[in-house]
Amino acid sequence: MAFEQRIEAAMAAAIARGQGSEAPSKLATALDYAVTPGGARIRPTLLLSVATACGDDRPALSDAAAVALELIHCASLVHDDLPCFDDAEIRRGKPTVHRAYSEPLAILTGDSLIVMGFEVLARAAADQPQRALQLVTALAVRTGMPMGICAGQGWESESQINLSAYHRAKTGALFIAATQMGAIAAGYEAEPWEELGARIGEAFQVADDLRDALCDAETLGKPAGQDEIHARPNAVREYGVEGAAKRLKDILGGAIASIPSCPGEAMLAEMVRRYAEKIVPAQVAARV
């Protein structure tokens, strides 16, 4: 089964469990609204790619890890869009959850998706409890403080911001989780896979900064120019467009070089190359 089918099937099963017969109907429908359409599902696809490169001897556990990670990511988007943070009106081409359902339900939706992510891992633990425990730990570390997406959001409240630490926590954290969890699910050590995740995450953030500066809202599927409006730290402000484009090229080259030795190393390198082609904004593609 293709990665996309595996991810969507496991995601649908997780959401269906959260929409049980006694669930409040508005919150139940908000759960599905928050995770669909799924976009590129970049993080879970990366996780399954690493697991496959490492042999993927427990595909059910890999699927659970992929969905747990994506649920956390979707939760972070719901919370990021709230009025107290970005106050965004559009996400993935449709009204944000708080616009469609209300702010209280958006908060509950994000909270529910976070809990659901860890529940998915707990339910998958019977066959490989040690691996499952490592997966829970890896995901928790990259979700909370001091190195997770919560820390990334927290950096935006600081007067002095370390751009590298900010990017590593806000965006890199879940990419590190993706590569490490893919390895763990297949029985490999997590630590050697941190650099690959960090580099892919930084590349994604720099590319996102370039898109935010250069693309319009229709192209993005969300409001453009948000970094400038909210005075957020970003690579374009730090390096300029040309400098950010060069930085992106360097990061992507380093990502391929950082892939640890594994049976599917060549396949994974090709996946990273294809991913690079997708994330580079058209306006700067010729420069990288």
Swiss-Prot record:
Pathway: Isoprenoid biosynthesis; geranylgeranyl diphosphate biosynthesis; geranylgeranyl diphosphate from farnesyl diphosphate and isopentenyl diphosphate: step 1/1. Binds 2 Mg(2+) ions per subunit. GO terms for biological process: carotenoid biosynthetic process; chlorophyll biosynthetic process; geranylgeranyl diphosphate biosynthetic process; photosynthesis. The keyword S-adenosyl-L-methionine does not apply. It comes from Cereibacter sphaeroides (strain ATCC 17023 / DSM 158 / JCM 6121 / CCUG 31486 / LMG 2827 / NBRC 12203 / NCIMB 8253 / ATH 2.4.1.). This is Geranylgeranyl diphosphate synthase. It is an enzyme of class 2 (transferase). PANTHER family: FARNESYL DIPHOSPHATE SYNTHASE. It holds the Pfam family polyprenyl_synt. Catalyzes the condensation of farnesyl diphosphate (FPP) and isopentenyl diphosphate (IPP) to yield geranylgeranyl diphosphate (GGPP) needed for biosynthesis of carotenoids and diterpenes. Keywords: Carotenoid biosynthesis, Chlorophyll biosynthesis, Isoprene biosynthesis, Magnesium, Metal-binding, Photosynthesis, Transferase. Belongs to the FPP/GGPP synthase family. PROSITE patterns: POLYPRENYL_SYNTHASE_1 (PS00723), POLYPRENYL_SYNTHASE_2 (PS00444). Its cofactor is Mg(2+). One of its GO terms (molecular function) is geranylgeranyl diphosphate synthase activity. The keyword Transport does not apply. Its EC number is 2.5.1.29. (2E,6E)-farnesyl diphosphate binds at residues 91, 170-171, 205. Mg(2+) 1 binds at residues 80, 86. Mg(2+) 2 binds at residues 80, 86. CDD domains: Trans_IPPS_HT. Isopentenyl diphosphate binds at residues 43, 73, 92. It catalyses: isopentenyl diphosphate + (2E,6E)-farnesyl diphosphate = (2E,6E,10E)-geranylgeranyl diphosphate + diphosphate.
